Every structure is written in structure tokens, then in C-alpha cells.
Amino acid sequence: MKNFMDENFLLQTETAQKLYHEHAAKMPIIDYHCHLIPQMVADDHKFKSLTEIWLGGDHYKWRAMRTNGVEERYCTGKDTSDWEKFEKWAETVPYTMRNPLYHWTHLELKTAFGIDKVLNPKTAREIYDECNAKLALPEYSARGMMRRYRVEVVCTTDDPVDSLEYHIKTRESGFEIKMLPTWRPDKAMAVEIPADFRAYIEKLSEVSGIAISTFDDMIAALRKCHDFFAEQGCKLSDHGIEEFYAEDYTDAEIKTIFNKVYGGKELTREEILKFKSAMLVEFGEMDYEKGWTQQFHYGAIRNNNTKMFKLLGPDTGFDSIGEFTTAKAMSKFLDRLNTKGKLTKTILYNLNPCANEVIATMLGNFQDGTIPGKIQFGSGWWFLDQKDGMEKQMNALSLLGLLSRFVGMLTDSRSFLSYPRHEYFRRTLCNLVGKDVENGEIPVLEIDRVNQMIEDISYYNAKKFFNF
């Protein structure tokens, strides 16, 4: 029987162990997509408790706690103490066995705090106090955590109207780790509620200094903000979409639709889809002009629980995997940009694992030989960000594309304790490839090439792909 979470955790063969310890583990971290709060990095935030750094904003844990019968006030309540919330989480942890939360929890305790104990109600107080004592030390600040995990670059997720003041402050402070913005313009194409859209466009006008009364004005304002993001080191965009939009439309139609929604009138379903289709193309062209990488996270059904959405807002644990037939629209959208000669580097993330092979084969349609892996299959996202999901994503990519050109892992997280997800990914990768070597499916004579592939997927591919 193997020990739980020892140095060879998840590494089932000798080859896997060598690949991880001698190659993957030595690589720095490039976290090219995350949801860290930039101000916390700029101010080098000090965490007052383990609850703040671990449970604050973590909808994965909240979902598990609710499922375990924990009252909402212990998840998101304002009048509940940090200890009370942590105690309820500790009571829940033993019930998360076989859920990735069980592994993440103990990997984070071990790598951040040097704690090998299993978290449960009996150990909760001891672990809580020990972690809180360490969090009071300077090296456990926000920046300290990033240094601890040898982070080299992080890319936050930012709206076009953001001032990026905290990115600027961080850079000017001389902090050695790069914190770069990512362009996330979802609100500029969210035309379902006219009043919300108009309020956003008015904010865009204020920030850009461009008076907006037409569609062309809006695009000019967005381009000005896009230029500003580029000046601040932005290399990527990101789009959170239910599905791909690729309706046929004319420029005149889009201008009319803009006037209608900006004037406060509700759009038809057809008009909404046409507008979103046009905006995806506009954004794609902007990114191409600057050599950015565009990312698409698609396939989530969000805010399913109306009651809790009204109470807590979005991103609080009430989203799930959607079922959309989007392959044709995805193809049409990519082809539309490619036909114009304006298809930039692209990463596609699916939330429904049924689409793994769809994406893995879609990539090959638009690789053009200009750079290795120009169109990428993103690492297992959200509900798929776990051992089984990672393996399935990498197996599909291996069978139908080139795993060796994969840009690898990202945290997609709001937490400064989530960097061990890179370790979890690297161990899973090394175990997958190591088994192939041991089984004679990859020649041991090519072990130097295998070693390099592991280092590339862990670090070098991303560094080159994003020009960091």
C-alpha cells in the first residue's frame, strides 16, 4: 500500500517519478489565466486567517459544503466568524474523498504550510492555528505566496474599462514577478438587458474619452482601450461564452441593432446572436493586429439558481456544464477570421467533456504552419480541472493532435493557494507519459526527447507561445 501524498504522489512508475522530479518539478510557473485580484498583488496583501485565503470566494468549497448539509451562513455569511466557517469546512473535507478538493486541500497544506496531517474535525484547530501563525509572517503575503511557488508570470482577467492601476503600481514597485492584464470584453457584447448594456457603454465612453452614440463609436472606444491594454503588456484576450456565435449579418444590420439596444429596446433572439457574432469577429481582428492569443471558455450554464443569484450574485457556486451543439458555429467563426487572414493564436476550452474530440480535431483545420500549435486545446477547465479531466483532455490531444506542442496548465483561480494545481497537472502529465515509456509505447532510446517534452509542456511552450 502506498502512502498518501508522499513525494511520488500520482507517479505510478519509476519513469514517471524521474520525469517529474528531474524535469517537471524544476520548472517555474507561468499562470497565463487566473482571476487573482490585482490590488492584492499591488498592495502585497496580508491574510488575516486561513479562512480568508482559502474559503473566501472559493465556490468549489462552497458547493461541497452545501452538498454536505452545511448552512449557507457558514459558506458566504457575513455574521459568521472565520473559525466557524473553517470548522465547517474541516467537517466537510473527510466527505470529499475522491473529489479533487480532497487532493487540492492536502497538497495546498503541504506545499504552502509544510503540514502533512490530514484535515478533519480532530485536526482542524491545530491546523488552523498553525496556518494562521505562518500567515502572520511577511513571507506569507500575497507576493510571498507567489515567490514560494516560483511563479514567473500571472495574467489576470480584466474588463476593457478597468484602469489597470494596480498592474501599473505592481510593475513600478519593482516586483520581480510579471502581472499582466488579460482583455475580457464580455460586457461589450452582453445585449440581453438594454439598460445594463447602455450603462456599460456609458462607462466605456467615460473611460475612453470617446463620445459614443453609434456602433462605430463603440468600436473606436474599445480599440482605444485595447491599445491601452497592449501598452500595459497584455498578450491575451479571454471570452466567456455559452456557445460560439457565427450568424450571417451585414454591417448595416449590426449598426441598426446597436441603435435599438442602446435606445433601450429589447432585442430578438436573432438580433442578439447577430450582434454577438459581429463582436467576436471585431475582437478577433483586434487581437490579430497585436499578435495576441484569444481564449474562449465555452459551455457553461450559469446562475441556474435564481434565488441564490439574487442573494449572492454570480460566481458563487450555482453554475454547471451545458449541452450545446456548437461545432459548426465554432468552425464557421474560426473560418470567418481565417478567410480574412486575421485568425490569431487561439485556445479553446470546453466545459462538456463530450466535446474533447470535437475540439481536438477542430484544431487541425486551422493550423497554418506559422508557429507550432497555433490553435490550442486548453487544459481541462473548471469541472474538468481534475485528474480524470486532465487525462482525458491530454489523451484526446495526443491521439488527434500534438501533445508535445501543448501550452499546459493554468490555475483559473481567485486564490493565492491554487498554484499547487500546476504540480497536480505536472504529476498527472508525467504519470501519463511515464506509463507509455514503461509499456514500450514510447521508446526509451528517445528519453531525452521525452524529458524535453515534459519541460516544454510544463513551462517552455507557454513562454514561447505567449512571448513572455
PLM segments and residue spans:
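Metal-cofactor-binding active-site regions of metalloenzymes
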Residues: 2-290, 342-344, 348-353, 360, ...
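Catalytic core of soluble alpha/beta enzymes
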Residues: 245-260, 278, 296, 300-344, ...
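Residue-level detector of anion-binding/catalytic polar loops
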Residues: 293
